[in-house]
Swiss-Prot record:
Catalytic activity: 2 glutathione + NADP(+) = glutathione disulfide + NADPH + H(+)
Disulfide bonds: C63-C68
Annotated active site: H462
Name of the protein: Glutathione reductase, chloroplastic
Binding site for FAD: S25, G26, E45, T62, C63, K71, G136, D328, T336, H462
Additional observations: The active site is a redox-active disulfide bond.
Family label: Belongs to the class-I pyridine nucleotide-disulfide oxidoreductase family.
InterPro entries on file: FAD/NAD-bd_sf, FAD/NAD-binding_dom, FAD/NAD-linked_Rdtase_dimer_sf, GSHR, GSHR/TRXR-like, Pyr_nuc-diS_OxRdtase, Pyr_nucl-diS_OxRdtase_dimer, Pyr_OxRdtase_I_AS
Source species of the chain: Spinacia oleracea (Spinach)
Cofactor binding summary note: Binds 1 FAD per subunit.
Transit peptide as recorded in UniProt: 1-2
GO biological process, one term: cellular response to oxidative stress
Keyword Oxidoreductase on entry: yes
Record's GO cellular component terms: chloroplast; cytoplasm; cytosol; mitochondrion
Amino acid sequence: EDNHSTVEDDAANYDFDLFVIGAGSGGVRAARFSANLGAKVGICELPFHPISSEVIGGVGGTCVIRGCVPKKILVYGASFGGELEDAKNYGWELNEKIDFNWKKLLQKKTDEIIRLNNIYKRLLSNAGVKLYEGEGKIVGPNEVQVTQLDGTKLSYSAKHILIATGSRAQRPNIPGQELAITSDEALSLEEFPKRVVILGGGYISVEFASIWRGMGADVNLCFRKELPLRGFDDEMRAAVARNLEGRGVNVHPRTTLTELVKTDGGVVARTDHGEEIEADVVLFATGRSPNTKRLNLEALGVELDRTGAVKVDEYSRTSVPSIWAIGDVTNRMNLTPVALMEGTCFAKTVFGGQNSKPDYSNIACAVFSIPPLAVVGLSEEQAIEQASGDILVFTSSFNPMKNTISGRQEKTIMKLVVDAETDKVLGASMCGPDAAEIMQGIAIALKFGATKAQFDSTVGIHPSAAEEFVTMREPSRRVPGAGKPKTNL
């Protein structure tokens, strides 16, 4: 089926070839690339604010304003805590009392997200994209209405409409839920929280546990499962939990919060085990939901799934042929570089004359806990589930060289999952310092189908932790795949 648009054919009938709702990672990429391919593009975004709502957001979106970027800045900030400890055995005599100034770091973080917000606006204008500030709503298959801050409604027609409105943190429905904050507020707290309770087992909860603990807070992390980070490799999940505990986080598995109560001293969080934990701040990191409620999609027949995410085909097209969607709002793989890939593929498909499907295989990702976890490809559990033959698992667990002097007791763990028959490396994971920096290179190898023999033929960089990935000679175990025919021999 032909998705292409020739920009001339009936452009005269529309104000724009493309109108994008949402100027975050995906929306900005799609708008710029479409404009570079000759399309006339309009885009709308809510007014800027570090904490989002249905009517405020900002150019740059979650990643830049209240996501990856400010989060990573805080992770860097928190990491110095452990580094200063480790420095002592390396001869650094830090005699005066060391204080941490949260307000200073927060101000620097805010300056940086404002700088990036301006850079994103400049990227749009340099590409010739027309930016409108206000809330977008789709009123017809080819018509968008933008409501400005003062209530003025503007209407524009477009041959194609792209939904790129992203997602927002959601709150569990428990008594006292209004006393809790989400990741939005956590990145912009006025005062440093000395006592924190975090509810959630995903990457956001684990990262904030590391951030606040690294800065000296008393942290209680509660999650429903036995281990945090469902969906990641079980061995890595256990390593992350162990490291959190080793660095002083109070970990509460198989625990959820039943009620929050305001007290003079702060907030008391009650758990389903009957515990009461007093905190200055309670953070809910219990998932995100797509921003689709106010777009008028049902009225237009744009199909949504049960979570409210926009359903799309493999080219990011919705059930209405002139309307497309990319990024978190489609709930495919909610990562910034994935939204960028989807935006690029959309522009090529619709305005570049080449049908391009996003490829979701072997996308590396990281959890910026301290120390971090990074993975690419299949976890051991996924590989076993999908395999029809045997799986070879290679693991290495070691005390990094840096720790031998600092005295820190924290093992790095690495793993390769290999198809025994073809020798192809199906997955790699690592929990330890610099995991994300190391995994990006491994991801290239996996993307191109590297075998274990090719890993083995690579000479390592010595001394480094990364070299362990090319020196794992003997498998730790051989596991039959779930689809392997059972014999009774």
